UniProtKB/Swiss-Prot annotation:
The gene is Dad1. Disruption phenotype: Lethal. RNAi-mediated knockdown in the wing results in a moderate decrease in wing size, decreased N-glycosylation, increased cell-death mediated by the JNK pathway and increased ER stress mediated by the unfolded protein response pathway. It is found in: Endoplasmic reticulum membrane. GO terms for cellular component: endomembrane system; endoplasmic reticulum membrane; oligosaccharyltransferase complex. Pathway: Protein modification; protein glycosylation. Subunit of the oligosaccharyl transferase (OST) complex that catalyzes the initial transfer of a defined glycan (Glc(3)Man(9)GlcNAc(2) in eukaryotes) from the lipid carrier dolichol-pyrophosphate to an asparagine residue within an Asn-X-Ser/Thr consensus motif in nascent polypeptide chains, the first step in protein N-glycosylation. N-glycosylation occurs cotranslationally and the complex associates with the Sec61 complex at the channel-forming translocon complex that mediates protein translocation across the endoplasmic reticulum (ER). All subunits are required for a maximal enzyme activity. The lineage of its organism: Eukaryota, Metazoa, Ecdysozoa, Arthropoda, Hexapoda. It comes from Drosophila melanogaster. The keyword Electron transport does not apply. It comes from the Eukaryota. Its main location: endoplasmic reticulum. This is Dolichyl-diphosphooligosaccharide--protein glycosyltransferase subunit DAD1. InterPro entries: DAD/Ost2. Residues 49-51 are lumenal. The chain crosses the membrane at residues 28-48, 52-72, 92-112. It is a multi-pass membrane protein.
Length: 112
């Protein structure tokens, strides 16, 4: 158990010292989206899915926003510059915003 706490402590200290502020902000957004998805799932289990289209739209939107944010984090990470050589962080953010607009238009259309 002591080894686990030392591993967690080392991970946290490395994260705080070595992670850029931009990535920390994306991580906070990812945590918020994850919490929103968990709340929607618990609500579905406790109360039900009526109206089903609204629940499905909300849950699909949450999962899709999480996936888009992970893609943004991968593109904005300075350690991944060799993988995304032709894409600047600004271009990655613009792609993220464009994909969010399209996603929310589709979700609003699905709700009816």
């Amino acid at each position: 158990m002591v080894e686990l706490s030392s591993v967690i402590s080392k991970f946290y200290n490395d994260y705080v010292q070595n992670t850029p502020k931009k990535l920390k902000l994306v991580d906070i957004y990812l945590g918020y989206i994850l919490l929103t998805g968990i709340i929607q799932f618990v609500y579905c289990c406790l109360v039900g899915t009526f109206p089903f289209n609204s629940f499905l739209s909300g849950f699909i939107s949450t999962v899709s926003c999480f996936v888009l944010a992970v893609c943004l984090r991968l593109q904005a990470n300075p350690q991944n510059k060799s993988v995304f050589a032709g894409i600047s962080p600004e271009r990655g953010f613009a792609d993220f915003i464009f994909a969010h607009v399209i996603l929310h238009l589709v979700v609003m259309n699905f709700i009816g």
